[in-house]
Amino acid sequence: MPVISLAQMLESGVHFGHQARRWNPKMDPYIFTERNGVHIIDLVQTAQLMDEAYHYVRSASESGKKFLFVGTKRQAAGIIAQEAARCGGYYVNQRWLGGMLTNWTTIKTRIERLKDLERRYESGIFDLLPKQEASMLRRELDKLQKYLGGLKQMHKIPDVVVIIDIRREYNAVQECQKLGLPIVSLLDTNCDPDWVDIPIPANDDAIRSIKLIIGKLADAIYEGRHGQVSAETFEGDDIPSAIDFEDETPEPVAEVADAEVAAAEPVAEAAPTAEAAPEEAPAEDAAPTAEAEEPAAE
């Protein structure tokens, strides 16, 4: 039995790719067809590759490997924090700071600074300081919590990195490749599959698609660590997040009718209405150049 059924993927909009003009030709093997100018991902292959990813992640978790989730886009940030916390992983969901992995020594000192400030704040020391000094320390604490809060328990470089939107997280991909860390990633139709080790062809823009795939990977980590899937589940749109989810202006993509998708996919029983992939921000079109920077330094 597959880890995720075709019906679940159709309902979550996993099959919706980008407009055909935005595609990466290397994704051609994973594309089923084109409908109204939009590429439709082959869900049969997605199901097979999801099974492979699930078993790989579960096996790695059983052997004690540590996982880092990376997803800084608005649709993914809350899901990343939620699922990483549930399965005992680490996460970056605000901004990837240059050198987060390749300059781990510096990052580790900033994490220790974060822990020290938290201890001082909780003990009430901030209240005893001059108002201006206390205000500066609170701002520093807030900044460190924002960018490094998901790494507080990470004592060494992780063994496996799970990434949402490898084009947006290009710097993270580069650092993983430099260190030889395996990458598990959702691949939309505009991605380059050569960048990752464990590909999962899927819509990486729709919240429900991201939640479905990342939730299953978190299940695999939890199962590998504890021998069973966590009973803690999150239904619907109950996604805690440190930031607001604002609707982005969608790409002018034509809707694909349910009956049409069902006819195009012979193995699917029905095709419920799914979310269309929103247009990427223009800044994401070009892969940014990796830069070395000291994180969260005042």
Swiss-Prot record:
Keywords: Ribonucleoprotein, Ribosomal protein. Belongs to the universal ribosomal protein uS2 family. InterPro entries: Ribosomal_uS2, Ribosomal_uS2_bac/mit/plastid, Ribosomal_uS2_CS, Ribosomal_uS2_flav_dom_sf. GO terms for molecular function: structural constituent of ribosome. GO terms for biological process: translation. The keyword Flavoprotein does not apply. The keyword Ribonucleoprotein applies. GO terms for cellular component: cytosolic small ribosomal subunit. It comes from the Bacteria. PANTHER family: 30S RIBOSOMAL PROTEIN S2 PROKARYOTIC AND ORGANELLAR, SMALL RIBOSOMAL SUBUNIT PROTEIN US2M. The lineage of its organism: Bacteria, Bacillati, Cyanobacteriota, Cyanophyceae, Acaryochloridales. This is Small ribosomal subunit protein uS2. Residues 251-276 have a biased composition (Low complexity). It holds the Pfam family Ribosomal_S2. Residues 234-250 have a biased composition (Acidic residues). HAMAP family: Ribosomal_uS2_B (MF_00291_B). The gene is rpsB. Residues 232-298 are annotated as: Disordered.
